[in-house]
């Protein structure tokens, strides 16, 4: 979970079962469907639901198809990455990449992936100096990304 830097809204990444990775912008009292509605499937390939929404179920703000195995997320708030400021970064366990998404209000658009991570991305955070730290498993390490 991360707090949007200007709206104060809580944004949450949801690693679905087999597929069904989502970003949800949390609203008080909203039901996001789990475990009855999902874009993914059970690991034994059985269907969780016939659809991913129903009356009273909030649709995800964004979902990845195919699944990236979404993990930690963060917003870029410092000027050190000027072209990325205001963007959302998401770690990918299955993709083994860092995913940058452009955010316009509540609209999320994939923009690019950062290659060369070489491991499952568990978490991403921006440091006070504006650099980005990426926690990677297999092998365990912390990468520091700085603007050129």
Language-model-derived ranges and their functions:
Residues 108-128:
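Conserved blade-ending motifs and adjacent loop-strand segments that build the rim/top face
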Residues 1-111, 141, 148:
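Beta-propeller domain segments
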Residues 87-89, 112-115, 130-133, 137:
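A general secondary-structure boundary signal
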Residues 123-148:
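Blade-level signature of beta-propeller repeat domains, shared across WD40, Kelch, NHL, RCC1
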């Amino acid at each position: 979970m991360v707090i949007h830097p200007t709206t104060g809204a809580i944004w949450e990444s949801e690693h679905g079962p087999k597929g069904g990775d989502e970003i949800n912008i949390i609203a008080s009292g909203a039901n996001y469907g789990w475990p009855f509605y999902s874009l993914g499937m059970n690991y034994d390939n059985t269907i969780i639901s016939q659809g991913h929404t129903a009356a009273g179920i909030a649709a995800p703000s964004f979902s990845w198809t195919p699944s990236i195995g979404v993990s930690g997320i963060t917003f870029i708030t410092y000027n050190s990455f000027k072209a990325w400021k205001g963007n959302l970064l998401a770690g990918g366990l299955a993709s083994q990449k860092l995913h940058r998404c452009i955010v316009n209000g509540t609209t999320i658009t994939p923009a690019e992936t950062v290659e060369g991570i070489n491991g499952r991305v568990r978490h991403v955070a921006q440091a006070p100096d504006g650099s980005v730290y990426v926690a990677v498993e297999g092998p365990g390490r912390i990468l520091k990304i700085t603007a050129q």
